[in-house]
Amino acid sequence: MASVSGAANALWMTEWLAAAMDLRPGMRVLDLGCGRASSSIFLRREFGVQVWATDLWFSASENILRIRDAGVEDGVFPIHADARSLPFAAEFFDAIVCIASFSYYGSDDLYLSYLARFVKPDGPVGIAGEGLVREIEGPVPEHLREWWTQDVWCLHSASWWRRHWERTGIMNI
């Protein structure tokens, strides 16, 4: 069986997020930044949705192995693409999920408006991932200095993301 490791607690986050969304069999769902496609496989198995498992860092050829191993090749379609250059038509998806990936590409002021064009009007966009309890202002606390490297500067607090998304005027948060 192909490896399914990837983002920390991706399946737990997917289960939690999906519980807050109205996913129904046959819906077309974009799983953006799906990593090794474990969240996509889960969504197909649990909800019967069709999933476009889209990731930049893991190849579609690698992900299809896991998808086949899971027996969901009929409803999970691996795509290798950059989140900032998606190959989909406007309003193609019924829903979009981003599990433990949005912070890597979504902090640009214009990104949410770009992403929203791919979901049908009033379609849900669900985002779950790691973050900060509060923003780090000023010097980094001693206990975080070793951990606080460029790799994690993209992490923000829930209140930061709320302000970031609310100002677009296109999402109910």
Region roles according to the model:
Residues A8-P25:
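Conserved alpha-helix/loop element of class I SAM-dependent methyltransferases that forms part
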Residues W153-G169:
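Short alpha-helix
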Residues A95-S107:
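A short SAM/SAH-binding and catalytic strip from SAM-dependent methyltransferases
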Residues D109-P124:
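A short glycine-rich, Lys/Arg-flanked "PGG" loop and its adjoining helix->strand segment in the class I
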Residues R84-I96:
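A short acidic, Gly/Pro-enriched loop at the edge of an enzyme's catalytic core
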Residues L30-L32, R36-S85:
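Class I SAM-dependent methyltransferase SAM/SAH-binding core
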Residues E130-V152:
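Short, glycine-/aromatic-enriched active-site segment of Class I SAM-dependent methyltransferases
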Residues M1-A8:
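Class I SAM-dependent methyltransferase Rossmann-like catalytic core
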